């Protein structure tokens, strides 16, 4: 007999995380960049919480679902491969947080892993985007640099703000309480 990955409670918690993160992405964008990407108020954290609460499989499924929803709500791509890289894979990487769910400082480590994974997929996508404009070796190096600067300009500020918030003792305690409630 196989164990269900999702109970009704897990589905509800994951659906609420997806809904809340989607509303935050749509309603509260600090700087919004012209080619996609923006600093949001903790939307990546909210998706990473699903992995932190329930482990890698529910975390990855929830994060991929969020990525698909982000594509439906506001797609931006130049090359068809970017659809896969920028949405289900990049946002899906936030579910990597689930691999740290039972570790000390699991939320912090999982969040960093998720954002790093998201960065890697956006970096590959950005390289594809920028190489549409340049075609030689020097151009490829410039494409990598341009993609790195562009992606870090919104991912890094949000990550730093979130890590500062998560390092606060009251927030750390609150997150532990929410995790026990989600798992009860």
Where is each model-derived feature located?
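Short helix-perturbing small/polar motifs within transmembrane alpha-helices
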Residues: 1-4, 10-23, 62, 82-127
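Hydrophobic transmembrane alpha-helices
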Residues: 1-52, 57-58, 93-101, 166-170
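Interfacial aromatic-anchored transmembrane helix boundaries in multi-pass membrane proteins
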Residues: 23-39, 64-99, 130-135
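Membrane-embedded alpha-helical hairpins and interfacial helices in multi-pass inner-membrane proteins
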Residues: 32-37, 75-84, 103-184
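Alpha-helical transmembrane segments of multi-pass membrane proteins
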Residues: 44-48, 86-94, 159, 163
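Short glycine- and Lys/Arg-enriched binding-loop motifs that mark or flank ligand-binding interfaces
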Residues: 47, 51, 63, 106
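Transmembrane-helix signature of polytopic, membrane-embedded enzymes
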Residues: 57-65
């Amino acid at each position: 007999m196989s164990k269900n990955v999702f109970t009704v409670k897990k589905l509800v918690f994951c659906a609420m995380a997806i809904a809340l993160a989607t509303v935050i992405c749509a309603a509260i964008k600090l700087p919004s960049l012209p080619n996609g990407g923006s600093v949001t108020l903790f939307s990546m954290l909210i998706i990473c919480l699903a992995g932190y609460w329930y482990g890698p499989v529910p975390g990855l499924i929830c994060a991929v679902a969020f990525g698909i929803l982000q594509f439906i709500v506001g797609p931006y791509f130049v090359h068809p491969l970017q659809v896969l890289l920028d949405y289900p894979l990049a946002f899906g990487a936030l579910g990597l947080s689930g691999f740290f769910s039972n570790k000390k400082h699991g939320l912090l480590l999982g969040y960093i892993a998720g954002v790093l994974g998201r960065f890697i997929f956006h970096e590959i996508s950005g390289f594809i985007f920028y190489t549409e404009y340049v075609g030689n070796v020097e151009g490829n190096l410039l494409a990598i640099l341009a993609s790195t600067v562009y992606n870090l300009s919104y991912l890094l500020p949000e990550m730093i703000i979130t890590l500062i918030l998560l390092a606060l003792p009251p927030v750390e305690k609150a997150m532990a309480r929410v995790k026990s409630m989600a798992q009860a």
